[in-house]
Amino acid sequence: WTGTASTDWNTAGNWSLGIVPTGQNAIVDTAPANIATISADISATPNDLVVRGGGRLDHTAGTAGTGGGSWMFVGQNDTAGTYNLANTGSVAGGITGFAQGTGSLNATGNLLVGAFGDNRTGTVRVNTSATLAVSGEFFVGDSSNSVGTFSLESGTVTVNNKIFVGNNNGVGALTMTGGTLTKTGGDQTFVGRDNGTGTLTQSGGTITLNHDFYVGQGSGANGTYTISGGGVLNTGRDFVVGRESGTGALTMTGGTITKTGDEKFIVGHNNGVGVVAQSGGTISVNNELYIGNENAGASGTYTLSGTGALSVANEVVVGRESGTGILNVDGGTITTTGNGNMYI
């Protein structure tokens, strides 16, 4: 991108080769006076779409995407990138990011925000009413000294494969105040994985995950999930806070968490350290709850207070198979339904 003629993505004179990228990588690695802007359906489909080198791409309307199976990078080659999708006025005042409105983006491969290489920084902000679809994996902060930030204020985000927030020595933060985030494929969601540090902060909107959800997974990992206000999480299969030598924390002051499927809600599993502090909101589990599970290295602590409500449809086990478990009840309510028993 040169921006020689105007801000219009579809104008050939704005590109260094004199053509709108088609079947080639589209690279925005500068932020000149004429900021690269997509304001209508793109006239040609690039291969990878890359925003790096301090570059900025504003997407105010229309549909854009990558070529079949190709990737989108926000931050690459030891540099930062900014992607604003939709009304860029919503990110005025020096706030940069990935703002989603009437436009639509389809990443046919992976979406990488400050990810897939060292020393990368990516910032994404999603708002208003359009759609973002990721056919591959979604990374926010991956690899050493790489930082990714993703904010969802409204709109619709759909991911078909794994989600990583803070992975492989990277730092990732996902903040959600509205909208919907849905994972459709049969793979896991990680917040803090394999020496990565991940945070998920949700005060509104709805997250729907159809597979395992791990907060703090693997050696050296630190994961934190904070839910408040009107936030809603629907998750199937295992929901584990602190797993396989990872450290995880769940703090809940409001909102609703519903765990469906046949698997379990586990706090501290297989050498993992998990801590849950619930002072409000409702957690419903349709199977077992284990606090400190599987071996002597597992440690789980669950503190229930205030107006917090916990409902478990099967057993509640505090300290299982040599694990160390602590259940503190200083208010709130615990209900077991069905054939549920409590073991301490």
Residue ranges and their predicted role:
Residues 42, 55, 62-63, 81, ...:
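Small-residue (G/S/T/A) turn/hinge positions that recur once per unit in extracellular repeat modules
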Residues 118-121, 144-148, 168-172, 194-198, ...:
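Short, solvent-exposed linear patches
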